[in-house]
Each structure stands twice: as C-alpha cells, then as structure tokens.
Amino acid sequence: MYIVLSHIWNIVRTQQKKRMLIVDEAWQLMKYDDSANFMFSLAKRARKYYLGLTTITQDVEDFMGSKMGRAIVSNSSMQLLLKQSSSAVDVLGDVFKLTEEERKRLANFPVGQGLFFAGQNHVHIQIVASDTETGLITTNPQATLQQAAAAAAEEQT
C-alpha cells in the first residue's frame, strides 16, 4: 500500500492537475512510523499539488492511536463520523469536543447516519444512497450474492 501511494505521490507532483486521492483502510498505514509519517506529509502537502486527500477507516481508534493519525484528523478541513464503538466515542469526544448528546448519537447511529464536521461546525446527517450506489458500496455478503445472482440471470437472458 505504501509503495503504491508513494508512486501515486510521485505522479501527482510531476503532473499537476486537480485530483482526488482516496486511501481506504488508512489505519494500516498508521501502524508503522514510516508510513504514518508519509501519510502526514501527504496530508500536509497535497493541496499544494491540487490534490484532495480522503482517508477512510472503519475503526477510528486504530487511526487515532497514532500521533500522526491524530494530526491528520485535526488538520482535515472536513470529517465524517459514522457509528462508533463506545470506547472510540470517548476518544473522539475529546478530539472533536462533542456534546454529551453527540456522544450518545455517535454510539447509536443506524446505518447511513453520522456527524459531519466542517471547521468548527458539526451537524447530524442522513446519507441516502441510490440503488446503484448501494450496489457499489455494500459490504453485506448476502446483498453481494444477490447482486451476483441477478447479474448471472441477466447474462442468461
């Protein structure tokens, strides 16, 4: 993952144009000092090269457990937090200065609801995905099998 990102970063710096880099499972990079420092440097310098950076992780505690991870989150212009474990809510409550009500909500949000942060402002949001979007992003094994079966049936006709 680090090698691929490093290669992408080299391309971004030599061929400047507006782009968005999405790093899924970013917590994996935060486990090691070298890759965490690389991500932090990337986050700090991306804008200079017309690059938007989005980091995604399911377990924010792994990300926030790193000094560099905390710095990346703190320096981000926007954050989106979906349902979190109670222990993660405690950490996030301190970092994001959450109210008691926001802490409760964050621990109990249903799928598609979360807190969106832009600067000092934070609001409760509901994300509604279209059927096409849901098909692309679902991680539900049963839904994935149904999609595969439907696609196979469509190919048969």
Language model features with spans:
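Conserved P-loop NTPase motor cores
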Residues: M1-R105, D131
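Conserved P-loop NTPase motor module
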Residues: I3-T14, N108-T157
